[in-house]
Swiss-Prot record:
This is DnaJ homolog subfamily B member 1. The gene is DNAJB1. PROSITE patterns: DNAJ_1, DNAJ_2. It comes from Homo sapiens. Induction: By heat shock. Pfam families: DnaJ, DnaJ_C. One of its GO terms (biological process) is forebrain development. GO terms for molecular function: ATPase activator activity; ATPase binding; cadherin binding; Hsp70 protein binding; protein folding chaperone; protein-folding chaperone binding; transcription corepressor activity; transcription regulator inhibitor activity.
Length: 340
């Protein structure tokens, strides 16, 4: 049975956004490993972060409410991919840093300085509700007076860094069949103290679908460098076709340049056309072939992006090789048989 994110935060289904925020504050403070040394606190802290990540996002929450964890994470109610709103495909995996989420939630401040920093900070406090001793509004800290001006209480609004773009080069064979690409990135992450920074390597997995067009963008939200003053940039991979030694791509069609002699162009020929999946198709031509002429082999191109069970065409583009010179006897014959 899948996870119940509402149960993780101690909420009932239908909880409001404010109730979700308050539940995250309460549970995150209770199980933060800096204060809770019990076995399993670290894992519980991660589960709380994942639950908040889902329930605080309207789209993820809608899918979870309809299909549960299995549908959210891609297994779907009938073994298919997770269903999003309006039937769109959606697959979720929690990649967040629970400590960074905690620090960002509290605006880069350490809430333990307020609630647990003094010797008597925990006296009379309900461990299940560390905010119970404070006159709080529905928003959390909004009505608490810590002896500072309101402007000092409110952290500066963070801005997200511009997207970081990388090329993702794929071969035509990979576009034909689909493939999985694993891209290693290095980025900076906040440590649990919310101030110091560590370098971290991460593997990003990209499922390249059949027929994807050049220029397709794959975005990994907030995987850029993180500091206490920014929202990490999105990492964006842009699909680029690798040059092919035989074919050229034209959307979902592939172009095969066929070099034939002048004699073949005039008298007819058979062209053995290779395909992306390794087959060879003999194509017979009986009519005169002009330089630059194109002929289609239907359905032998790349899969169509939206309907990959269908395919584009393989286009034969002719290049006619003319002889450097013609003997006089042959020239005489040609003059007699060729039309003016």
């Amino acid at each position: 049975m899948g996870k119940d994110y509402y149960q993780t935060l101690g909420l009932a289904r239908g909880a409001s956004d404010e109730e979700i925020k308050r539940a995250y504050r309460r549970q995150a403070l209770r199980y933060h490993p800096d204060k809770n040394k019990e076995p399993g606190a670290e894992e519980k802290f991660k589960e709380i972060a994942e639950a908040y990540d889902v329930l605080s996002d309207p789209r993820k929450r809608e899918i979870f409410d309809r299909y549960g964890e299995e549908g959210l994470k891609g297994s779907g109610p009938s073994g298919g991919s997770g269903g999003g709103a309006n039937g769109t495909s959606f697959s979720y995996t929690f990649h967040g840093d629970p400590h960074a989420m905690f620090a960002e939630f509290f605006g880069g401040r350490n809430p333990f300085d307020t609630f647990f920093g003094q010797r008597n900070g925990e006296e009379g406090m309900d461990i299940d509700d560390p905010f119970s001793g404070f006159p709080m509004g529905m928003g959390g800290f909004t009505n608490v007076n810590f002896g500072r001006s309101r402007s000092a209480q409110e952290p500066a609004r963070k801005k997200q860094d511009p997207p970081v773009t990388h090329d993702l080069r794929v071969s035509l064979e990979e576009i034909y069949s689909g493939c999985t690409k694993k891209m290693k990135i290095s980025h900076k992450r906040l440590n649990p103290d919310g101030k110091s920074i560590r370098n971290e390597d991460k593997i990003l997995t990209i499922e390249v679908k059949k027929g994807w067009k050049e220029g397709t963008k794959i975005t990994f939200p907030k995987e850029g460098d993180q500091t206490s003053n920014n929202i990490p940039a999105d990492i964006v991979f842009v699909l680029k076709d690798k040059p092919h030694n035989i074919f050229k791509r034209d959307g979902s069609d592939v172009i095969y340049p066929a070099r034939i002699s002048l004699r073949e162009a005039l008298c007819g020929c058979t062209v053995n056309v290779p395909t992306l999946d390794g087959r060879t198709i003999p194509v017979v031509f009986k009519d005169v072939i002009r330089p630059g002429m194109r002929r289609k082999v239907p359905g032998e191109g790349l899969p169509l992006p939206k309907t990959p069970e269908k395919r584009g065409d393989l286009i034969i583009e002719f290049e006619v090789i003319f002889p450097e010179r013609i003997p006089q006897t042959s020239r005489t014959v040609l003059e007699q048989v060729l039309p003016i």
